[in-house]
From Swiss-Prot:
It comes from Desulforudis audaxviator (strain MP104C). This is ATP synthase epsilon chain. It is found in: Cell membrane. Keywords: ATP synthesis, Cell membrane, CF(1), Hydrogen ion transport, Ion transport, Membrane, Transport. One of its GO terms (molecular function) is proton-transporting ATP synthase activity, rotational mechanism.
């Protein structure tokens, strides 16, 4: 018997980065990690920057999302991401520099610094480094 699947889409303002059937989707919601199998209860959640993983036919695909929203209903998972990329698209050196910059901003404790923005930049950089490391091994 074939495994049940659900339609999964990852959409950014620039492109559709993924659109296919999948068995399982894992995202990082703002209130914690979420996993979706076919037939999941309808849900809408905001996403924090981090890894998004999709399982199809026993194989995992990883993406980095820079926040956004996920909607689950009628055996469909739609991710509307501010930005998203595949690990092979990531410039690891650039991500490491972005992480250093964000850490310096946060450590400076300058009242002029937008702390929320700096924390989001740090989370994005860490997720990009983590994803890039998965393909560099």
């Amino acid at each position: 018997m074939a495994e049940a699947t659900q339609k999964v889409s990852i959409v950014t303002p620039e492109r559709v980065i993924y659109g296919d059937e999948a068995r399982f989707v894992h995202v990082r919601g703002t209130d914690g990690d979420l996993g979706f199998l076919p037939g999941h209860t309808p849900l809408i959640s905001s996403l924090r920057p981090g890894l998004l993983r999709i399982q199809k036919e026993g194989q995992w695909s990883t993406f980095v999302v820079a926040g956004g929203f996920v909607e689950v209903r009628d055996s469909r998972v739609v991710v509307l991401a501010n930005a998203a990329e595949r690990p092979e698209e990531i410039d690891l050196a650039r991500a490491e520099k972005a992480k250093e910059r964000a850490e310096k901003r946060l450590a400076a404790k300058d009242p002029e610094i937008d702390v929320v923005r700096a924390k989001a930049a740090l989370a994005r950089a860490v997720a990009r480094i983590e994803a890039a490391g998965q393909i560099k091994r």
